[in-house]
Amino acid sequence: MLKEISPAPFGHFEMASPDEGADALRTIVLRAPGIEVHVSPFGATITRILVPDRDGVVADVALGYDDLESYDSAVDRPYFGAVVGRVANRIANARFEVRDENGSVVTRSDALVANNGPHCLHGGTRGFDRHWWAVASRSEDGTRCRLTRVSPDKEEGFPGACAAAVEYGVRADAVSGGACLHTTMTATVDAACPVNLAQHTYFNLAGHGASASDGENKRVDATAHVLRVDASRVAVVDRSCIPTGVLMDVKGTPFDFTAPRAIGASMPPVERPDDPGGFDHNFALNGAFPPESAASAEGAAKGAAETDVSLATDSLKLKRRRSLRVAAEAFEPRSGRRMVLECDAPGVQLYTGNFLNGQKGKGGAVYGKHAGFCLETQHFPDCVNQPKFESCVLSPGETYEHRMVHTFFAE
């Protein structure tokens, strides 16, 4: 079972005591009025998010496991609650090469670990999600913690060392009346390398196990949630979910969540026997791009079916901090729970748990297809190989930063 870490000075912090063995999964518990979040240093993983419904009944709305062995499985990898990297999402053909304006190679790798067919997914077989992170600090009031790890040169085939940090914090928002989970991810490198970290929590706002009927209550899965995404375009992908470089206007398509819409009423049609159905698509967030891309937004507004545009920016613009803005919000009618997601990333991947297939989760819950959904804020998939997309290549002396806020309400 998960074990709460009792308050102790960091530096005297033990991940697992000898009598508990290597399979112990301890968690840091963060608390603020209206919210409790459990974080495991293994994978910097969010294992629980407890928030009340409209009647004040508290439930855990994050899918996950009770034991370390399940989180560390090499066979079954849903990435429940983990920070994924060094590069989230897919890198086509597990290779990349980046050249500067003079044609000189900035960085390259032909030896990334291919763990999704021929492609590299979420950093490889043992990405950031399958390593212990050090607990660098925890606030005395129990509302914040900071986790760090150093990914060595050539880990999963990536060039150079990458020092990463994740800070989680919780607070009550007196202005909105909601309860907030703040996440900030940062990284530096000693050699030019793509960096694109994402937080991979699966949500079910009716409760993590609500997708299985209990005989009294109707099952509630991802399809029952009402979703709005502030994106008028979505990245077109091939059959292996690699972007083609084209952004499609969502108007009149299953991807149009510009107004609140039930996920189940919007599922794209299944076109192939090997298509699992559901969403696994990256949305281009409105207002995320610099003025150069304004023409693309204008083209989409005119109703163009597909807009082949460049979202590439130079290094200075890439490192310029964006403001937080609302990217998406989800509402679950039975519980009355609403979640608003703010971020500073250019895109958000909507994934509806298409490959969940009966994983045994916390408290005996069984997670079938569409048991939960992810809203993974990030750079575009395969952007390191897509010259029309904003680059995620980080150089020595630069700092990568990715911020998001999840605010929970009951109404």
Question: Where in this protein do the model-derived segments appear?
Answer:
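An exposed, glycine/acidic-rich loop-and-rim segment of catalytic or binding clefts
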Residues: 2-411
